């Protein structure tokens, strides 16, 4: 069963390359192949999740044992995000049929394959490959919306991402030059001797900035507002919800396993604080729903970076909870924004036109600002208790900034809610009021239902997150899983 | 599992919410909800032992999330506040039923949403009052904040704007509390009350200061303490009538409840007293006392300037909160009793006053003090209720407001705080002047021609008003009834308990017996009545006929103006109204706006690559150096 893990990456990849051909042969068959592959992936991962003993395991690809061969590493954290990738791929599947749909669906499969790979890869080079693959798929998908604004945004993103990749590669080269390996478990063994120096720090920082482009790290996130505002809402939801978290996950793994320098955490903390400040403040004046969500997403990712900067992986639980929470909320909000594009003032009266959407917007906003007993509150609670426990003043500053940013966030989110609930201006015809409806509303409703279910089941969910975080924090477990004490016993 | 009384109460309250939610659109939904509030009140009365110092009733509801235990329970403190909450909810909801409801719906209001919001407010307040640890306190706190937002915002228009301002303040307060919570947790490792109580003993002064500021500020926002008071008056005043009666009666007292629980019970007045402000003679406790006093003075004089009756009352609500905090901070037996008793008294007369004003709006369509007058003959019962209410608000005998204010003054004198006493008296002076403006401009003076046909408010509105008026008088005559509850609250929060009698308090430094005071007062009235009635027959004329004093003037000529009331006084104190708090608020908003502009500029720049490379270079340089 464990071997099937590789299929979750291989099948979507294969599908992506075959889909354009299959579509020519039979549209009816081609349309269903993508969702079928993703559903199968969900089933494999779900099965592993439910039947597995919750012990992490490693899969060596091609029969070569690591560190020579490449491996997939699956602990509960990785499985969770891999599952999220497949599931969100399914939820945000580009169902619309037109002449472009083959290309778009193929790119989506590619994006899911790459995202799953990012979650599962056990060595740095594969991570890089999947990272690039994600970028390529994203360019294609953003540009697919066909507007000139989308092309301009894509170009900017392309350049930024390209330079980011070069930096990432530079960091990887530094590491390889120093240690001669790129396997994460192997690196974790070697790191205390070989990488806890200035070279290691330099390597980490170039990796951080390179990968940070996708993780919306300040200040390499200037592509975010343009791309989210011009790409389709479904894609924005996938990017803001999942891809940014996966990039974050890589940085988190690196920080936990390889780079223990306090300076590394410090840089992340400072950039995180700046991200929160810049994102939330910029959202305050945003005149358009999607742009506001994009800025707020930058702010939220900043919060995640603050959580990640907590020493010795203490922030693991907070990162996990906040990341999952943001994943659900932002996906839902972007889905709502689908029907609510354009200037915010246009939305007057839309609550009467689509009450469910307005209700969902309020629900998501409340959870985002952390109103108890919604899950957002618990996620924030885990973060602030950890932050307040630190003696370093910079962490307390992070805490202060985080709390103040929440106030700003509540103000701008509920300003929008107030606009939505205002009565429509007299001179407007009813059909001019933007309506959220159809598939996007259903999808948002799905996330809303998930949010409410989590609220009710918060105690078991919390316990499960705690075990996942504890497992992910355990460096020795990671090393021992990839390199078992008795050779050959792992498979 | 057997249900405790508290479980019953919370379930009852939850059921009320469900009724309002699902069948609240049907006929007589308002009455149904009102009856359910009555049921909740009865359940609360079954717990009456709590109000007389009878221990704790826990809820069976408790759970553990992420290592945090959450529990709920009632003690004397919670019971006292819950009594006021449910009492005002019952009467406000009763007031809303029938005539008011119909006219509200006719004006396009959503009565279903109104009842729902009320039920939600009551439930969330009960949850807050029942909190058994700091985490459940915070959860309850936020629930109350957002439920209040719903009630304030539902009228739309100006009300929504006021509610937006409120929620921004409330979020800021909430986040201050959240931060305080995290700091407490970092030093005690738990948010259970007993663990915190132990941790406070070994806390450093800096940390204690920080916590007092965070919690005091956070809770103070809801109380409308200076300088966080700007949101309150518009938000309460613009809420639909019965809603503002309810909010004005109890909502901002939740802040006082939390202050009592956290600052007084957990941190202890003694600990707060030991926090000195460097290079000055005052400590944190004096600071709180002075904040309380300024909260009395400024909003009270702002109230005097208001031309809308609802706004005038709402501004007073802020000022009266100052007396409560002042009493609690003085913290001797009398002061504590005065502050706590004032919570009860204020709720009674504030609700009555808001209802009377709403009744006037119901009949005349306006609350503008410049467009009313002479209604005393048209609406005599409402006039009586308003009169009783303002006597209570101004703190004069024979109404209940006198007792609580007397206790606060007495304690200030006993404890040797003459400056605070003087300031509090200045506040009372402002109160008396402004409530006179209220009653004069509505009920006295010249009747407007367009109000000639105005009738007394309908009985569905009159009944709760009269009940409240009766409570105001009875608890003024026998303050011992609420003082018994107050004494148990004092014991629970660790303040010295007052020695009360049915008619007032017994103390070596000065006793008060309202039965005597009122007896003497009414003897005086009796003598006056004897003189009045023995003076011979009086002649009855039509109200519109009796202003001219012999001159030939028709009723539509305005010769008595209520506009620009207190022009002389306003000229005198006008210089003080510079709107500095408004200026402060505006400058914070402008600052955020400006920063936001800068940040947007940052993201609008086209040279993103430049950022990336310069950051990379910068961090590399940082590593090398």
Where are these regions (language model features)?
Chain A
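Transmembrane helix-loop-helix hairpins at membrane boundaries of multipass inner-membrane proteins
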Residues: 1-7, 11-98, 102-106, 185-189, ...
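Alpha-helical transmembrane segments and their helix-start/interface "positive-inside/aromatic belt" motifs
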Residues: 26-38, 152-162, 354-358, 438-444
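Hydrophobic alpha-helical membrane-insertion segments
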Residues: 33-49, 162-170, 361-369, 446-460
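Alpha-helical transmembrane segments
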Residues: 34-41, 86, 109-111, 205-207, ...
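Helix-to-loop transition at the C-terminal end of transmembrane segments
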Residues: 48-57, 176, 180, 458-463
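Hydrophobic transmembrane alpha-helices and their helix-loop junctions in integral membrane proteins
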Residues: 91-102, 112-125, 139-381, 385-411, ...
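Short phosphate-coordinating micro-motif centered on Lys-Gly-acidic
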Residues: 132
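Cytoplasmic/organellar membrane-interface segments at the starts of transmembrane helices
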Residues: 231, 343, 351-359, 413-491
């Amino acid at each position: 069963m464990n071997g099937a893990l590789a299929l979750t990456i291989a099948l979507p990849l294969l599908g992506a390359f075959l889909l354009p051909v299959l579509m020519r042969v039979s549209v009816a068959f081609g349309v269903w192949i993508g969702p079928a592959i993703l559903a199968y992936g969900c089933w494999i991962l779900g099965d592993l999740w439910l039947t597995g003993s919750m012990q992490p395991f490693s899969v060596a690809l091609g029969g070569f044992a690591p560190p020579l061969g490449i491996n997939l590493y699956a602990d509960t954290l990785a499985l969770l995000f891999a599952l999220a990738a497949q599931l969100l791929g399914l939820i945000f599947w580009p169902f619309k049929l037109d002449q472009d749909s083959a290309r778009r669906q193929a790119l989506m499969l590619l994006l899911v394959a790459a995202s799953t790979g990012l979650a599962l890869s056990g060595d740095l080079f594969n991570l890089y490959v999947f990272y690039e693959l994600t970028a390529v798929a994203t360019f294609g998908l953003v540009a697919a919306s066909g507007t000139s604004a989308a092309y301009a945004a894509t170009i900017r993103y392309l350049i930024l991402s390209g330079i980011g990749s070069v930096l990432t590669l530079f960091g990887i080269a530094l590491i390889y030059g120093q240690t001669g390996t790129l396997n994460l478990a192997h690196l974790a063994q070697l790191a205390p001797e070989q990488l806890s120096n200035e070279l290691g720090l330099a390597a980490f920082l170039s990796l951080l900035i390179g990968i940070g482009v996708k993780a919306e790290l300040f200040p390499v996130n200037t592509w975010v507002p343009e791309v989210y505002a011009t790409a389709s809402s479904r894609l924005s939801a996938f990017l803001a919800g999942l891809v940014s978290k996966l990039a974050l996950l890589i940085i988190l793994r690196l920080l936990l396993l390889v780079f223990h320098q306090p300076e590394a955490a410090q840089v992340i903390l400072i950039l995180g604080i700046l991200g929160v400040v810049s994102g939330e403040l910029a959202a305050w004046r945003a005149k358009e729903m999607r742009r506001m969500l994009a800025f707020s997403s930058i702010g939220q990712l900043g919060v995640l970076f603050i959580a990640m900067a907590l020493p010795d992986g203490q922030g693991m639980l907070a990162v996990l909870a906040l990341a999952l929470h943001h994943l659900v909320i932002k996906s839902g909000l972007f889905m709502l924004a689908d029907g609510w594009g354009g200037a915010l003032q246009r939305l007057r009266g839309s609550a009467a036109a689509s009450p469910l959407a307005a209700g969902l917007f309020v629900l998501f906003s409340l959870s985002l600002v952390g109103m108890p007993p919604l899950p957002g509150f618990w996620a924030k609670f885990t973060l602030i208790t950890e932050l307040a426990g630190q003696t370093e003043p910079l962490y307390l500053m992070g805490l202060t900034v985080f709390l103040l940013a929440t106030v700003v966030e509540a103000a701008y989110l509920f300003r929008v809610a107030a606009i939505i609930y205002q009565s429509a201006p007299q001179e407007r015809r009813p059909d001019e009021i933007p309506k959220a409806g159809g598939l996007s509303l259903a999808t948002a409703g799905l996330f809303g239902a998930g949010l409410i279910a989590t609220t009710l089941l918060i105690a078991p969910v919390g316990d499960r997150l705690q075990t996942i975080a504890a497992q992910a924090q355990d460096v020795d477990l990671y090393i021992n899983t990839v390199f078992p004490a008795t050779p050959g016993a792992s498979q | 599992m057997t249900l405790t009384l508290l479980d019953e109460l919370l379930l009852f309250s939850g059921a009320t919410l469900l009724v309002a939610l699902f069948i609240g659109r049907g006929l007589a939904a308002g009455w149904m909800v009102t009856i359910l509030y009555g049921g909740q009140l009865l359940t609360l009365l079954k717990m009456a032992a709590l109000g007389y110092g009878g221990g704790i009733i826990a809820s069976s509801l408790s759970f553990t999330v992420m290592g945090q235990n959450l529990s709920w329970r009632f003690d004397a403190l919670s019971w006292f506040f819950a009594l006021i909450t449910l009492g005002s909810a019952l009467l406000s909801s009763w007031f809303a039923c029938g005539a008011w409801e119909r006219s509200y719906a006719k004006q396009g209001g959503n009565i279903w949403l109104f009842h729902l919001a009320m039920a939600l407010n009551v439930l969330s307040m009960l949850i807050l009052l029942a909190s058994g640890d700091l985490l459940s306190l915070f959860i309850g706190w936020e629930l109350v904040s957002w439920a209040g937002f719903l009630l304030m915002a539902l009228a739309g228009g100006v009300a929504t704007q006021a509610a937006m301002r409120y929620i921004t303040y409330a979020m800021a307060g909430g986040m201050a509390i959240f931060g305080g919570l995290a700091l407490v947790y970092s030093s005690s490792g738990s948010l259970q009350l007993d663990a915190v109580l132990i941790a406070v003993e070994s806390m450093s002064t800096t940390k204690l200061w920080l916590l007092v500021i965070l919690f005091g500020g956070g809770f103070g926002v809801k109380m409308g303490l200076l300088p966080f008071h700007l949101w309150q008056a518009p938000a309460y005043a613009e809420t639909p009538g019965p809603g503002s009666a309810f909010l004005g009666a109890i909502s901002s007292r939740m802040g006082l409840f939390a202050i009592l629980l956290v600052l007084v019970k957990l941190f202890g007045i003694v600990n707060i007293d030991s926090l000195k402000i460097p290079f000055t003679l005052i400590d944190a406790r004096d600071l709180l006392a002075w904040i309380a006093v300024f909260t009395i003075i400024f909003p009270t004089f702002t109230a005097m300037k208001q031309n809308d009756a609802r706004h005038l009352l709402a501004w007073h609500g802020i000022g009266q909160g100052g007396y409560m905090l002042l009493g609690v901070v003085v913290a001797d037996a009398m002061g504590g009793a005065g502050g706590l008793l004032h919570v009860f008294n204020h709720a009674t007369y504030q609700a009555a006053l808001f209802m009377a004003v709403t009744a006037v709006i119901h009949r005349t369509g306006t609350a503008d003090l410049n467009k009313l007058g002479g209604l005393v003959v048209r609406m005599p019962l409402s006039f009586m209720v308003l009169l009783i209410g303002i006597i209570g608000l101004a703190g004069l005998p024979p109404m209940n407001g006198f007792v609580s204010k007397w206790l606060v003054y007495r304690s200030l004198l006993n404890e040797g705080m003459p400056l605070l006493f003087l300031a509090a008296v200045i506040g009372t002076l402002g109160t008396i002047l402004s409530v006179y403006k209220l009653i004069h401009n509505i009920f006295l003076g010249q009747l407007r021609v367009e109000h000639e046909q105005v009738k007394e408010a309908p009985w569905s509105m009159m009944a709760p008003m009269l009940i409240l008026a009766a409570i105001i008088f009875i608890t003024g005559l026998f303050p011992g009834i609420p003082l018994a509850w107050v004494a148990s609250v004092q014991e629970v929060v660790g303040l010295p308990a007052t020695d009360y009698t049915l008619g007032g308090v017994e103390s070596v430094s000065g006793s008060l017996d309202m039965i005597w005071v009122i007896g003497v007062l009414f003897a005086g009235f009796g003598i006056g009545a004897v003189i009045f009635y023995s003076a011979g027959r009086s002649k009855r004329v039509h109200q519109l006929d009796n202003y001219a004093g012999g001159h030939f003037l028709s009723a539509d000529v305005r010769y008595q103006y209520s506009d620009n009331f207190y022009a002389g006084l306003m000229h005198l104190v006008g210089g003080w109204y510079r709107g500095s708090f408004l200026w402060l608020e505006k400058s914070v908003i402008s600052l955020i706006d400006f920063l936001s502009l800068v940040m947007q500029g940052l993201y609008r720049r086209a040279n993103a690559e430049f950022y990336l490379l310069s950051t990379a270079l910068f961090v590399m340089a940082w590593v090398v150096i």
